[in-house]
Design a protein with these regions (language model features):
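Membrane-embedded alpha-helical bundles of multi-pass transporters/translocases
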Residues: 1-15, 26-27, 31-34, 125-139, ...
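Intracellular loop-helix junctions on the cytosolic face of multi-pass helical membrane proteins
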Residues: 12-159, 181, 185-193
Length: 243
């Protein structure tokens, strides 16, 4: 999150001031530095992150192609498929609806036919939480699109602070509040009053909704030019991040 905070400020500033090819170039340079840092320090990780059964990866899956190489190959083919689907937005919607319907139908059928009552209930709860998670992230990730456009068009900013730089608020709040939330969950867990996972999901959705409600409130205080004070945007990001 320190990297996300610094990178968002730098890349957005460079992109706005000198051109987005430089902004994206700086982002690419940062990722290369991050990869080099990881590869340099991987020797200190020991077996952490290693596959539990590494011998299985070396076994041949097709002719002389190992399981590991097959994973790389099919991963690359999926990149091509996803790229194609993105170009064909209409077909993408049909594809996602079809895959989603088939997947959910199979899971429900499997729950009814193969699972015990306890297992079935847990899987159905998991499906509900997945749906809540999809809703949360669909709203949260508006930060990179509609909320940035809203910031650019409808928020009073300083002379050098661009709309893209507001993306740094999320990692900033994470850095500042991570110790606070860690202490809260440690304390509540120790006392036996920590909220359950479904309750945490509910709180997250409520806070995302409150974040957008803050923008609605801010619109009531908009000036003649339709712009709102930056404090409303900051409060929205705070609510979304803590959610």
């Amino acid at each position: 999150n320190i990297g996300a905070f610094i990178a968002t400020l730098l890349c957005a500033y460079i992109g706005e001031e000198y051109g987005w090819r430089f902004g994206f170039g700086l982002a690419g340079l940062g990722m290369i530095i991050g990869l080099i840092t990881f590869l340099t320090g991987v020797k200190w990780l020991g077996n952490l992150g290693s596959p539990p059964n590494s011998d299985k990866l070396s076994k041949n899956l097709f002719l002389f192609i190992s399981v590991e190489k097959s994973i790389y190959f099919f991963g690359f083919m999926l990149v091509i498929l996803v790229w194609y689907l993105i170009q064909m937005s209409g077909e993408l919607g049909i594809f996602l609806i079809g895959i989603g319907t088939i997947t959910i139908s199979w899971i429900i059928w499997y729950c009814i036919k193969e699972c015990s009552k306890n297992e079935r209930n847990r899987i159905l709860v998991m499906l509900f939480l997945i749906a809540c998670s999809v809703l949360f992230w669909a709203l949260f990730e508006q930060a990179a699109s509609s909320l940035t456009l809203f910031t650019d068009r409808n928020v009073m900013m300083g002379s050098w602070f661009s709309a893209g730089m507001f993306q740094a608020l999320n990692p900033f709040f994470i850095i500042i509040l991570a110790p606070v939330f860690a202490s809260i969950w440690f304390f509540t867990s120790k006392k036996g009053i920590e909220p359950s996972t479904p309750k945490k999901f509910s709180l997250a959705l409520i806070q995302v909704g409150l974040g957008f409600a803050v923008l609605v409130l801010g619109s009531n205080f908009a000036g003649p030019d339709g712009k709102v004070a930056v404090i409303f945007l900051v409060m929205m990001y705070l609510l979304h991040t803590t959610g």
